[in-house]
Structure formats: structure tokens, C-alpha cells
């Protein structure tokens, strides 16, 4: 049982975010998360020698350093009575442990099958959503998912994973690509356009084919913006990517400089100080909507800069190495790079139970482990 949990704990952890994203199953998702955290923590404690070999593995050293930074920050700026900070500290530590252990004990599965299974689960969610709500263009489409942006995250990543697969596409897979593309656009998420463009860039680079696709996309763009819909293209044309973000960036910036050096604490990720929000806007759900500002708000400029340095350094390492490798799944690198772009306008890479954030950390750890094992074999 424990061996199975070590191998597939990351799968449960990731797919549970789907339950959390569906209003009718959110309560179940909350319970699954708590049980997984508790059981995995016990499994770690009763297998100290095995876990030591994993957590101290050179490929996962960047995750260990981030965990140690969290512990160090907690000891300096928090007390044992800060329950929410303790929850974040433990959840982040177990999250990184789940990822590291899964890759170490089940590497071949995550290299050859996991991404396919991920696409299948998302496609299943899409099909079930269409059974209950097939009206794609009456507004921002959400299907089963309570938040249209979350559905866009699911479908655009599934589209990219399937699109970047080098295997010859079957007719059914071509149909799935078209379906995922249409669903992604119908969500009204402007970030979908960036994700799809990035996927084409990963696939074809700056080639003649991509130039042709760019002209084709531009033609479709001008066609759709003249139709009264609420798709990603229409919203991008009328609002731009950052239209409703600048004010929230301003509040995040003002919040950071209230405690610039050491931040507001581990329990204050995506935090905005209420005192900087105008009275007329209080009561609305306002957050940084920027992963980098969220980290600086949480940790301050000193610890936050160290964390961002570790993230970007590891990203550069695996990206540079990947250019020389034809074996590693390109989709993992896409997940990492797209998350860094998305973090400019969404609170990404800092939370615990967010789909793309989990995949981001998993992708970094997976490519780091792939790089280590390949270099070691050579």
C-alpha cells in the first residue's frame, strides 16, 4: 500500500484539484486532500531511510532548499501559535515530498504514460460537461468547472500536451485537439491565446509553417471579433490581457512596500493589505493576480528574491539541457515555461492546490531528475 502511494501519490494530488474545481465535488476534494496529506506524512515518518535517499537526492536539492528556506523563515518570523502558517509550511513540504518520491520510484510511468492519462482525464471532464451544458457561446463557458479560467487551464494544457506529442496523430486525436481548442476559446480566458501560441512556437519554432499559421490565426481573429460572442478572442480584443489587472498590481505593489524586506508571512500568499484598497472596492475578491508579486508579498524582498532566483536558475538549467536532448517529453518544458508566463497575470507557482502550479513544480523536478540520470549514465 505504501509503495503504491509513493508511486501514485502525485497522480492523486494532481487529479484531486479537478474535484476541487467542481462545485458539487469540492467537499470530497477537501477531504481527499487532508487524508492524502496525513497518510503521506505518516508514510514518510515510517520509512526514514528510503525517504532520506529521495529528499536528499541531488536532482531534488532545489526543492529541499526551498523547504529549508520555509522552515528558516517560519522560525524567525512566526510562532507555534500561527496555525495557518504551520499549515502552509507542512502542506508545501509534503507537496514537494509527494512529487520527489513519485518521480524517484515511478519515473518510467511519468515519462511514458502520465501525460497521456492527464489528457484522458481532462477530455472526460470536457465530455461530461458537454452533456450537462453544451451551449458553448452564450457566455463564458465553464462546463462542470465553477471557474471558466480553471477550465481554460485544464483544456489549454491538455491541448498543448497532445499537440506536442511527436507520435502520428490518429483521426480521433485530431478531433480531440479541435475539441480542446474550441472549449479553450469558449471559456473566454485571454491567457488561452498565449498558451496556444506558445504551443505552436514549441512545436514549429520560427518556421515558415508557423508564419502561415500566424496569418491564418490573424484571419480567424478578425472574423471572430466581429461576432458578438464572449470567447477568449473577443475578450482579448475588447479588454487586452492585463486590462483588469493593473489596479490589482498597484495594490500588490503598495502592500509589498508596507513590509518590504520580510513580507507578511507564510500564510499570506496572494495577500493584499485591506488598508490599500479603496472603501468602495472592499468586499470584492481582490488579490495580486501575479505569482511574482504574491511571492514578494509573502516572503518580502530578501527571501522572495532568493526563491525566485532558485526557480529561474533551475528553469534555465533544464531548458538549456533540454535543447540537447531528444528523449525528454517536451510537454513538461512547455508546462514550466507557460506557468512562468501565466504568473505575470495569475497567482501561479505559490499556492498548494492549484492544477498548473502542481504541474509546474512536478515538471521542474521531473526534468531535473531526467537531466541528472542522463548525465550520470553518460
What does each model-found stretch correspond to?
Residues 5-8, 54-67, 93, 100-128, ...:
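Interfacial loop-to-transmembrane-helix boundary motif in multi-pass membrane proteins
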Residues 57-61, 170-172, 204, 208-215, ...:
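Hydrophobic transmembrane alpha-helices and their immediate junctions
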Residues 142, 235-250, 254-258, 262-299:
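Long extracytoplasmic/lumenal interhelical loops at the membrane interface
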Residues 32-37, 59-72, 81-104:
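Aromatic-anchored transmembrane helix interface
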Residues 102-105, 109-137, 146-206, 313:
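Alpha-helical transmembrane segments of multi-pass inner-membrane proteins
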Residues 186-187, 204-240, 253-258, 266:
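A membrane-periplasm/extracellular boundary helix in multi-pass inner-membrane enzymes
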Residues 37-42, 333-378:
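Transmembrane alpha-helices of multi-pass inner-membrane enzymes
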Residues 1-5, 49, 164-169, 361-378:
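A juxtamembrane structural motif centered on a specific transmembrane helix
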Amino acid at each position: 500500500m505504501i509503495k503504491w502511494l509513493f508511486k501514485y501519490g502525485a497522480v492523486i494530488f494532481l487529479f484531486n484539484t479537478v474535484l476541487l474545481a467542481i462545485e458539487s465535488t469540492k467537499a470530497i476534494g477537501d477531504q481527499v486532500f487532508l487524508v492524502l496529506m496525513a497518510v503521506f506524512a505518516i508514510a514518510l515518518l515510517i520509512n526514514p531511510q528510503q525517504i532520506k535517499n529521495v529528499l536528499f537526492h541531488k536532482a531534488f536539492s532545489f526543492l529541499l532548499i526551498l523547504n529549508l528556506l520555509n522552515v528558516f523563515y517560519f522560525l524567525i518570523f512566526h510562532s507555534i501559535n500561527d496555525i495557518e502558517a504551520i499549515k502552509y509550511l507542512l502542506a508545501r513540504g509534503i507537496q514537494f515530498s509527494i512529487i520527489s518520491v513519485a518521480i524517484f520510484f515511478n519515473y518510467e510511468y511519468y515519462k511514458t504514460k502520465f501525460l497521456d492519462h492527464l489528457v484522458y482525464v481532462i477530455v472526460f471532464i470536457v465530455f461530461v460537461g458537454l452533456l450537462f451544458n453544451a451551449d458553448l457561446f452564450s457566455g463564458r463557458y465553464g462546463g462542470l468547472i465553477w471557474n471558466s479560467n480553471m477550465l481554460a487551464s485544464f483544456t489549454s494544457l491538455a491541448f498543448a500536451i497532445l499537440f506536442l506529442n511527436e507520435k502520428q496523430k490518429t483521426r480521433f486525436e485530431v478531433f480531440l485537439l479541435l475539441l480542446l481548442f474550441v472549449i479553450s476559446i469558449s471559456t473566454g480566458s485571454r491567457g488561452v491565446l498565449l498558451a496556444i501560441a506558445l504551443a505552436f512556437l514549441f512545436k514549429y519554432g520560427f518556421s515558415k509553417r508557423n508564419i502561415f499559421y500566424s496569418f491564418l490565426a490573424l484571419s480567424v481573429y478578425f472574423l471572430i471579433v466581429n461576432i458578438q460572442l464572449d470567447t477568449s478572442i473577443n475578450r482579448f480584443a475588447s479588454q487586452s490581457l492585463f486590462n483588469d489587472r493593473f489596479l490589482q498590481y498597484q495594490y500588490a505593489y503598495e502592500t509589498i512596500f508596507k513590509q518590504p524586506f520580510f513580507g507578511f508571512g507564510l500564510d499570506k500568499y496572494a495577500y493584499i493589505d485591506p488598508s490599500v484598497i479603496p472603501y468602495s472596492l472592499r468586499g470584492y475578491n481582490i488579490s495580486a493576480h501575479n505569482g511574482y508579486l504574491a511571492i514578494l508579498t509573502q516572503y518580502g524582498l530578501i527571501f522572495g528574491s532568493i526563491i525566485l532566483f532558485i526557480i529561474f536558475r533551475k528553469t534555465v538549467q533544464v531548458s538549456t539541457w533540454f535543447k540537447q536532448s531528444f528523449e525528454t517529453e517536451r510537454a513538461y518544458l512547455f508546462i514550466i515555461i507557460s506557468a512562468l508566463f501565466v504568473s505575470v497575470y495569475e497567482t501561479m507557482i505559490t499556492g498548494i492546490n492549484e492544477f498548473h502550479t502542481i504541474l509546474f513544480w512536478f515538471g521542474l523536478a521531473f526534468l531535473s531528475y531526467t537531466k541528472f540520470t542522463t548525465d550520470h549514465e553518460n
